[in-house]
Amino acid sequence: MISVKNLSYWYPDAEKPALDNVNLEIFEGEFVLILGASGSGKSTLLYALNGILEHEIGGKIRGHIEVCGKNPITSRVCDMATAISLVMQDPEAQLTQMNVWDEVVFGPENLLRPVEEIVQQAERALKFVGLYDKRDCLVTELSGGEKQRLAIAAALAMNTPIIALDEPTAHLDPMGTKDVFNVIKNLKNIGKTVLLVEHKVDDLLDIIEEDDRIIVIDNGAIALDGTVHEIFNSHARDIERLGLHLPQVVEVSTRLGIHPVPLRMDQINIPALPVQLHNPERERKVYDPIIEVENLDFSYENGVQVLKNISLKIPRNSITALVGHNGSGKSTLLLNLIGLLKPVRGKILYEGKDINSLNLKEVLREIGYVFQYPEHQFVTKTVKDEIEYGLRVRNVNELEREKRVRDMLQMFGLEKMVNRHPFTLSMGEKRRLSFATMLVLKPKILIMDEPVVGQDRRNTEYLIWLLNKLRDEGTTIVVATHDMNFLAKCADYVIVLNRGEIMFQGDPIELFNNRNLLEAACLDDPPVHKIASKLGYTKIVTVEQFCSSLIEKKVVR
């Protein structure tokens, strides 16, 4: 079905290949999970299969590709659209129509298929993803998870034998992620050939089987290729060394020497686990607030109220996590905090002063903001110029500019990309560039909207280390996130938003131990916390805490 031989590819003006002598065969009905570090070539491989690289992006390509009997290097992209459908990371960048129904029929209409066939395929696709009852809705009325399911429905309506999905849950909350993964599971069940690039490996365990396939890409080359059972039982340490996420159940089992490695929590023999754990002590800190919000309401111009009677305090010199489902109001609240949006009612106090009475330029000199979508803040044509831009605006002298830019390039592993256009970077690389553009300005407060989207394990852990370092040096950090493992590792304080209202403010441990609150807010606790809680240790929220606790008690030798 898919045959790739000696494939190498260079992006325009790139010296190093993004794909390096790739060879693989994928057979009909296979489910293939593609793992790899940020910028390793995962997305590039998918783009090679449908002809986007050769015909839309350009660059240099060598080797042979065959997809359902077609060569994407020589075939037109529109011809490849009958063989393979692609669902991208950001549904907003893929959806083109105003109406749900129009979006699903758009592709088949362009192929001039009979009307009866188009209607039949569209109805079937919408029912398959659970959106048939919303077929007359505007796309703008859908949640983030629904938009991604719509993108999958549009791909299904093309009736291609292969569906490729490039991090389809990157921007989704835990419940939205589960909904999309359930759709992907159903794609497996009806016999579609599915290629999935994904970082959220914990949630994936609900849909993959031991005989499914994993391909690991490292620096553009295939590093590992085998069944799920083979990879997780024999190569878990290799995956860690490559800087990739392991499912927490696999990570715990590997560290404790449990074989064979289970794939699901319900497969762990809880009574057989050593129970000499201890709950880690957490220092109760008393913070003084740097930002206070009092009785804030906010509505957009269409009259829809997004934030309702918000009152909160952002602790100084802390890492505060803002969590909630897609559409709960997190991004809107963050934009209010920096004065880019104005509340209908209420106050935002920065250092005790109403932020709306202050000069916005002066406020933004002290507050750095990293957008959810990095592309929204890029304004130049090279990575170097992007990092330097804010320094130029602030009239920083040339020597100091050069030093700071050099430090940022090194800090975020972007040294070899100085002349790349920001829009040609991978999702993870774009995210790291967006961090660099803000940190180079040395803000007093750093606000980050979904900072770990598209990040591999190595970069996520580095970011956690960096945020802790910045906090210890006096920076106040606010992060909006859907990643509960990330929250567990670095947050001092957590605020939960649900439908524009605050449901909870306090210690992350209290949140993870409140099952009713988690379910109401469409959140979930880390898998390792579930294991520890069954053993009665409710303060253990990370794999490191779980395993080090056993080691300290000399249970593991």
Descriptions of predicted regions:
Residues 163-166, 446-449:
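Catalytic Walker B motif of ABC-type/P-loop ATPase nucleotide-binding domains
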Residues 35-37, 323-325:
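The feature captures the beta-strand-to-loop junction immediately N-terminal to the Walker
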Residues 138-142, 146, 421-425:
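Conserved ABC ATPase signature
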